[in-house]
Amino acid sequence: MEAAIVDQQISDAELDIMKIIWANEGPALFAHIMDSLAAKGKTWQKNTVIMLLSRLKDKGYLKAKKIGRRNEYIPLVSETEYQTFQTKKLLDKVYEGNVKGLVSNLIQSDLLTGEEYRELKKLLDGGR
């Protein structure tokens, strides 16, 4: 994965497209993106998707490669990089960088299932 600037905010619609490309685990053709959106109940016009892909390219999240008459879209930011950026942003904005506050909130607000709690505890214990 090429280094990219991840600090560009993306819209929910742009994130929907990135999730499709990330799930593809490699370059995605425009037709695949359109089919995947339709399967998720998103009946966006072709021009709307083209505009969203263009914005993602401008923001450094994607690059397009011409294959004959088709475009292949390649992610420049991995899903993990994006998740890390968003988690840090939430941590800084809402919890003022206090990881303990975030984890405490997750546990005390019953947002975690029993299995998720055990997995988190194992991670925090360092696998001990």
Label each residue range with its predicted role.
Residues K63-A64, G114:
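Short beta-strand "wing" residues that participate in macromolecule-binding interfaces
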Residues R55:
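Alpha-helical DNA-recognition elements
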Residues I67-F85:
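Short, cationic-aromatic polyanion-contact patches
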Residues A38-V49:
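Short, positively charged loop/turn segments that connect secondary-structure elements
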Residues M1-I20, N24, E81:
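Short alpha-helical segments that sit at the start of domains
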Residues F85-R128:
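Amphipathic alpha-helical dimerization/coiled-coil segments
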Residues G60:
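Glycine-centered, phosphate/nucleic-acid-interacting loop/turn motifs that mediate DNA/RNA or nucleotide
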Residues P27-L37:
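Short acidic, hydrophobic short linear motifs in intrinsically disordered regions
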